[in-house]
Amino acid sequence: MSEQGANKTVADDGTVSFKKDRLEIGLRPMTDAELNRRFSSYEAYGGGSPNPYTFGGSTVFRTGETPQRFTVFLASLSNYQYPKVYLDPSRVYITTSNGRKYYALNFEQLSTYYRRYIRGGTGGNDPGVSGNAHYLLKEREGILKATMFVDEVVFSAQELEGYLVFEPIAPDVNELTVHIPDVVVRYDYKGDPIENLNVEIHFEREVGRIYPDGSKIPNSNRRMAHDPTPGAD
């Protein structure tokens, strides 16, 4: 499996966990297929599905493929060690082997992303927005609020789980590191942070290149790119 460094383990489902005593922070890369199953009740909607994380079953006309809408990780935090722990999801970012950098998207950014799909019509709660479009937007926002990793303190003997969402990782990236900076684990008597942790978790991807015909590798040797998996040295 992967060589993740000290205090890290890799589970059978691909979750990489950082452990410090009885504090555990885990990341699991999610495939579009897994996310579609998670919201399978919306699968029949295709590209109009309220599932906010994928394009569902819709395909691109010219290639017949379903593009990746976002790169998604299931993040978990289990705190049985400290009085309270704080992980700021907006500060999580990805660096890649070829120099790219991706910051986690917050709810407001994702809501803005989906508002651009609302076009014309009348009705709904906003002027010029159709009732159906407004309903779809609110469904997506509701799912995001219920399933994204929440920006809040995790007290002793509590656990927190939710999705971290990024723009799609470029197809030429074969190695990436997820950085979780400044996880606060101790506070002074005034409530100010006095001790924090910086967590880095590494993944590898099997990737190809985008060719003029739209394939990810030449048609003579076609191989689809995979979502991130724990990297192996």
Annotate each predicted stretch with a short phrase.
Residues 1-233:
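Conserved functional micro-motifs across diverse proteins
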